[in-house]
Amino acid sequence: MPQDASTQGRYPDATVHAVLDALTRAAPRPWLIGLSGLQGSGKSTLAAQLVELAARRGIVALALSIDDFYFGRGARQRLAREVHPLLATRGVPGTHDVELLHGTLDALRQATTRRPARVPRFDKGLDTRIAPSRWRPVGRMPELVILEGWCIGVPPQDAAALATPVNRLERHEDRDASWRNWVNAQLARHYAPLWQRLDRLIMLQAPAYSVVARWRDEQERALRRRHAPRALSTEALRRFLMHYERLSRQALKALPSRADLRIVLDEERRVRRLAKRRQAIG
């Protein structure tokens, strides 16, 4: 039986080897890899495993999370006052410092021991980015950079698709559709150029949006068992996920035809198959 990445804590070794093989055997070798997957799909886990395996093969790799480029609470509160109250919640396009992310990628390309790049880190417990003096220094250009996040590679929606609310959050708290239109505009204006920098896009493909709530609830229950201060209750999690439902559904619809490599998951997060565009590879 295939391993379950959620309960075993790791993706199967065969999957990780196959993914890294697909990346490193390409000519020319890609540098910036996008790793996209819905919440709870195991993006950070897979990114870390790819970096570990690359190191064993003598390849210098680095994982970045788009979460580390969130605006802090103060900046988002300004957005909430000036644009829409729902922007107080981090996560949707428009709540990341995309300029900082571009700058970090540029710095990594030029990193040396004398002029190291510095990788930001966001403290979710404090809801702010840690001080630059504590950012991770990188003293040489990585051979492979993996950028992971829930919205990586997701294209904006057509204007007509924004008219109808997808859940009660949009129905009651975004009655005039101004929040979702603003988020969509950010995706088109500021995130699309970032996606264009990707040399390859990998998708952790969930079977349906309906599994996201259970996957994330499993993670939150694990946090509650450890008495983590930021663990969400089931009801709080349900509301939280509504912020991302629209673009999560857009990802499931749009990314399968855009991804260079899909890791197809079942409802238990087990890997069913790996597929390149129109071609199975595992």
Regions found by a protein language model. Give the residues of each.
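Hydrophobic positions on the alpha1 helix immediately C-terminal to the Walker A/P-loop
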Residues: 46, 50
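Residue-level preference for the first positions of well-ordered beta-strands
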Residues: 30-34, 60, 144-146
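Extreme N-terminal, non-catalytic leader segments
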Residues: 1-33, 38
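Conserved lysine of the Walker
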Residues: 43
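Conserved NTP phosphate-binding and transfer environment spanning the P-loop NTPase/kinase superfamily
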Residues: 151-282
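Conserved nucleotide-sensing/catalytic segment adjacent to the nucleotide-binding pocket
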Residues: 62-63, 69-126
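Phosphate-binding/switch loop-helix module in NTP-utilizing enzymes
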Residues: 104-154
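Post-Walker A helix-loop "phosphate-sensing" segment adjacent to the P-loop in P-loop NTPases
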Residues: 52-62
